[in-house]
Regions:
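Active-site metal-binding core of divalent-cation-utilizing nuclease and nuclease-like domains
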Residues: 6, 31-58
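Conserved catalytic cores of phosphodiester-cleaving nucleases, focusing on short active-site segments
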Residues: 48-72, 84
Length: 127
């Protein structure tokens, strides 16, 4: 019987795949002129995979790695969007210098043997 954190457990493999996908997306963004402000930022209300800035825009980016881009796109659920939005609010409290930027929620999709796909303005806050 394997321990939950063993190298062969599905959870560990998924975590490694996620770390790789986020790294790939950071490079993809940098090559397109984005400056990475933070990555893997956590607070009690949630986690933000990547925060990136270009010009007057601060993108809050959720990275999804799946076997194909379609299933990756479908995996950002409303509950997760709300958690990410709460985390973004908490982040901005720690970085008031970024509060004047236009806040945008993006998704980056990663699938094997394909470049990352960036979906800008993937959702908006309700209200």
């Amino acid at each position: 019987m394997r321990a939950a954190g063993s190298a062969r457990s599905p959870r560990h493999r998924a975590q490694r795949r996620g770390v790789f996908a986020e790294s790939l997306c950071r490079w993809h963004l940098r090559l397109r002129g984005w400056r990475i402000v933070a990555s893997g930022w956590r607070c009690p209300s949630g986690e933000i995979d990547i925060l990136a800035r270009r010009g007057g825009v601060l993108a809050i980016i959720e990275v999804k790695a799946r076997r194909d881009l379609a299933s990756a796109a479908l995996s950002v659920l409303p509950r997760q969007r709300r958690r990410i939005a709460r985390a973004a609010s908490a982040f901005l409290l720690t970085r008031p210098d970024l509060a004047e930027l236009v806040l945008r929620f993006d998704v980056m999709l990663v699938a094997p043997l394909r470049p990352p796909r960036h979906l800008p303005d993937a959702w908006r806050l309700d209200g």
